Design a protein with these regions (language model features):
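Catalytic-domain carbohydrate-binding cleft regions of carbohydrate-active enzymes
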Residues: 1-275
Length: 275
């Protein structure tokens, strides 16, 4: 990275357990070092970059990615806001501190706007700051089914602002029927995005199959008509911890059939989504 040496000289990385050098961890096909967001100077450096390189350039939200903090040296040392601590004790907290730093930068830059952020990684509490998704899923009917169930579990666990990469992120492109069904399912989730890096070098796009484009358009139009409802659900989730995606048994526990294996779910209390 062009600014790696600068950051290392300023001591903004998590440090190796045996030296004061930055820790080195495997990243993709090489090595890298992780920023230490328990160091106030790191937070300030990050926020300056978010502001000058993104927000001032017209990009008004942040996608906090590759933030699992897979530091292989569990004893690697973190600043700990003045009380040094090993990364193994606070690993899940690091992405939370990262997204909070991004949130604060956006709030300071545009205090009149409600900030929108995404994070790939995190833990309980991340719903205070960001929207998230199920990660790099693979194109298949099974993925569509199990992503839906994963989203319900996340919603019941407090991570209510969730969704999945519609059509699958990796693998070959979806066929027309799978793509339509995935879009129809996806528009009923808090996060709806068609996002891909297909193995066959194609790109998932709403118009990729002209024969089903009208069905795709209809589903997306429904999404826009439901925006006031989504807005209300998001407020209720924020204020009262109300799950946006709800297994049918959550509101109908006296109906034994709702406990049978089923892919249907409720969007809020009032819309039943047949899957």
């Amino acid at each position: 990275h062009p600014r790696y040496n600068e950051v290392a000289e300023r001591g903004l990385f998590i440090r190796d357990s045996e030296t004061d050098a930055p820790e080195h961890s495997s990243f993709w096909d090489d090595e890298g070092s992780n920023l230490d967001f328990t160091n106030p100077q790191t937070v300030a450096w990050w926020q300056e970059g978010v502001t000058t390189q993104l927000l001032e350039m017209g990009i008004d939200s942040t996608w906090n990615d590759n933030n699992e903090f897979e530091v292989w040296d569990g004893e690697a040392r973190c600043h700990g806001f003045g009380r040094e601590i090993a990364i193994k004790h606070i690993r899940p907290v690091m992405p939370l501190l990262m997204m909070r730093a991004s949130l604060e930068a956006q709030q300071r830059f545009a205090p009149e706007k409600r900030p929108y952020l995404i994070s790939r990684s995190g833990c309980a509490g991340m719903q205070r700051y960001v929207q998230t998704w199920s990660g790099d899923n693979r194109t298949s009917w099974d993925t569509l089914r199990y992503n839906t169930r994963m989203g319900l579990g996340m919603s019941l666990s407090g991570l209510y602002n969730v969704g999945h990469d519609v059509g699958g992120f990796s693998g070959d492109k979806p066929d027309a029927e799978l793509f339509v069904r995935w879009v129809q399912n996806g528009v009923m989730h808090p996060r709806f995005t068609i996002h891909s890096w297909n193995d066959d070098h194609t790109v998932n796009e709403p118009w990729m199959y002209p024969g089903v484009t009208p069905a795709i358009r209809s589903a997306i139009e429904l999404r826009y008509r439901l925006l006031p409802y989504f807005y209300t659900l998001l407020w209720q989730a924020h204020a009262d911890d109300e799950p946006m995606l709800r297994p049918t048994f959550l509101d109908h526990e006296h109906d034994a059939q709702t406990f049978a294996e089923c892919d249907d779910f409720l969007l809020g209390r009032n819309i039943l989504v047949a899957s």
